[in-house]
Structures are given as C-alpha cells and as structure tokens.
Amino acid sequence: MQIMNNGARSAEVVNYQGSGAAKRRRDLAYKVARAAIRKMKREETKMTLYDELVARGLIAQVTDEALIKDLINNGKATFYIGFDPTADSLHVGHFMALCLMKRLQMAGNKPIALIGGGTAMIGDPSGRTDMRKMLTPEQIQHNVDCFKKQMARFIDFSDDKALLVNNADWLLNLNYVELLREVGACFSVNNMLRAECYKQRMEKGLSFLEFNYMIMQSYDFYMLYQKYGCNLQFGGNDQWSNMLGGTELIRRKLDKDASAMTITLLLNSEGKKMGKTASGAVWLDPDKTSPYDFYQYWRNVDDADVLKCIRMLTFLPLEEIDKMDSWEGAQLNKAKEILAYELTKLVHGEEEAKKAEATAKAIFTGGDAANMPTAKLEADSFTDDEIDAINLVFGAGLATTKSEARRTIQQGGVSVDGEKVADIAAKFPKSMFEGDGVVVKKGKKSFVKVSVN
C-alpha cells in the first residue's frame, strides 16, 4: 500500500502469509516430509537469522527483503518496536514482539523499545471499531514503569545494548504549526483514507484526534532514525500502513532508506487471536496472571496449535522441534508440557516454571500441591457464617461474574472438596475454609485452594 503523495515510491512488499492454505491443518505425512526437507537444507547450508525467522513462521511481510536480510544477519540493525502503555502490564499479545527483540539482540542487533507515552494520549484506531479511552499522564507514567520491569526479562538494557525510549519526549513538545509545515505536507489525505486502519472506522466515525495517529507514528520512526540511527521497524500487520508512512517520511525528508517488517499474528487454528481466556487477557505480570495460570494457559492449547506455538515462541532449536512434527496422541500432551514450561521459564524464571509444572502434575495425579493457586474470602463474604455456591465460585476467581458462576454450577462444572455441587443454593460453613482451606474446582483444569482471610 502506498501511503504518501504522488512521487513517493511504494515499498517492495514480500508477503509470507500466503493464502488460506497456510492455515489448513497438515496431515501427518506432509509434516514428516516437510521436516525432512528442512533438515536436509540445514545440513547443506548454515541457516541465517533471517532464514530462521522465516522457518519459525514469524515474518508476515517486509519492504526490502535483501536490505533487511543484510541488516539483521550481520548485526547492523538498530530496530524498534512500539508499545502503547494502555494497561499496567504487558500481555500475551506482546509476547511475539518481545521474543523477536530477544532473538535479534542475541544476534548482535540493537533493540529500541519505544514506549508510546505520547501516542497513548491519542489512542491507536487500528483494529478498533470505537474510540479508545484516553488515559491521564499519571496513568500512562505508571504503566510505563510497569513495562520497564517486565521488558527486562527479555531485553538486556545494560551497557547501551538496548534503549528504552518514550515518544512523549518529542511528541508532547511539538509545535502544531511546525508539525504541519515539516510533516503534514508529506502526507496525502486521500491515500491515508485508503489505509485499512481507517477504512473500518469511517462508518462509525473517526475523530480528527485519531486520524493523526498515522502521522505521529511515522514521526516516531523519523525521530528515531535521526536520534539513534534506527533503520528498521517491526510491528503487527494492523500497523503496516503506519509503518510504511514512516519509511516514506524518512525517504522524503532525509533521502535515506529505512525498512519495515510485520510480525505474524499469534492465531489459533480457528483464526482467533491467542492470549484470551474466559477471565480476560493472559498477562505477563504475576499479580494479574499467576505463573501457574500462565503455565496452564499454554498447557491447555489445542492440539492443532501446540507445535506452531513451540516453533514461534520458544528458543528450542528448530532441529529439536522438527522431530515433534510427527508427534500425536499422548506425545502432543508432552509437547504442551514443553511449551508451557519453556514460556513460563521465559516470563517468570526457571524456579516459578518448575513450581507451576510440579503443581500441575500433583493436581492431575490426585496429590497435594503446595503451589496451587489460592484465593482468600473476606469475612463479609459470609452470611450467618455461611457462603452460597455462587458467591464461592465468584469469590474464588473462577468466574468473572455471578451470572457466569451460576451457569457453571448449573452445568455441573463445579466441585468443592471433591464433591460436585448440583444446587446453586448450596451453602458452605465458614469453618470449612479455615486453616489450609478447601480446593474448589471448575471443569477439569481450573483449581483454587480457598480459605478465609
């Protein structure tokens, strides 16, 4: 897609996603053949970093493939990925980007984590059908501080090996007239309105505030190029128009080449974004999603998704992953355990990963689990020293609403201390939850040890 005025050159796009055929489940024979071919090719020639990214299915589309290959394979890329601090924790939706930054840094490239402290005050319309809620500067700063801590698990910021930059440093001090003169003349409104991120908002209404988002993101790339020599931007497919805007702005203003590459979206076999549960997003903050719950999320992925997730998200050698292509049945359960352990170790550390793994095994073999997730009921949760089943399930965090708790009980999906709860009016004495507490179970895979606070 060409974003700029007439005369701007279009990016030479290479698209790795292909048609819907890429989403069809491969049969066993095809998997084995594909793994054999990959093994033969790797033995013939040493795989480059770019080749590995392609083999892992991480690249969706790129501008200048030859230039990007040269940059990242030879450790010459100073690249950035943007993170809008709209929450106080990163989540699984950010996971792919963080892993990519880690891979490229390990190969000698320099990451820039750009925190959108300025753009967060506008809100990105990409992928939205409504306007985002605007945050206060204080809320944004709190979220930025939380991001810094979580990113440090993936990126080495020591000795100038990586940069953490906030675009508020330049966006909040911009003079409007200066911006119009310097940047506005480089953009065509007609071309901007053809961008997918704006098309889907035209019928419901697009504020002028949000309309400026593309210009601001393009300006980010322009500033990062000037200040830090940033020559490559990564982002999601929904950011493609904005990213091309940045490469064209750099070309028009500085007569320099900059590149862009989009990362494959993490979708399940049904084409839906991964990283959501009935309780909401899967967060990287252990206070929002416990290491055990994080482990369980990956342990419970669909059979059709497990090998794709291992290939895209873990740092296991491709040769080792190729051997799993022929796995089926009980072997896929082993693959899920590998996936859950590797990702929990990456996000929460090896100790927490081992605890989560041990807890899961203890629970599913009927043993006791010291590290089982816990919930504390407040004293005012009880009436006449009793609590009903609906409030128990809701208070234990096994349902996001009392209506959901009611439905789960009515469907026979809840047990307390090993006994199935058949009546929504069932009540449990407060004394039952004193001491070590009682295990409350929802379905086959959600367990919480509940006690009185």
Can you annotate each of these PLM segments?
Residues 62, 67-125, 233-240:
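N-terminal catalytic cores of NTP/NDP-binding nucleotidyl/phosphoryl-transfer enzymes
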Residues 250-453:
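Conserved nucleotide- and phosphate/pyrophosphate-binding catalytic cores
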Residues 125-141:
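A charged helix-plus-loop insertion that forms the helical arch/lid used to bind
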Residues 30-46:
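Short, Lys/Arg-enriched N-terminal segments with co-localized hydrophobic residues
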Residues 16-17, 28:
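Short hydrophobic targeting helices and cationic amphipathic motifs
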Residues 56, 136-137, 143-262, 268:
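Divalent-metal (Mg2+/Mn2+/Ca2+)-assisted nucleotide/phosphate chemistry catalytic cores
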Residues 1-4, 40:
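Methionine residue identity
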Residues 3, 18-19, 32:
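Glycine-biased, low-complexity coil/linker segments
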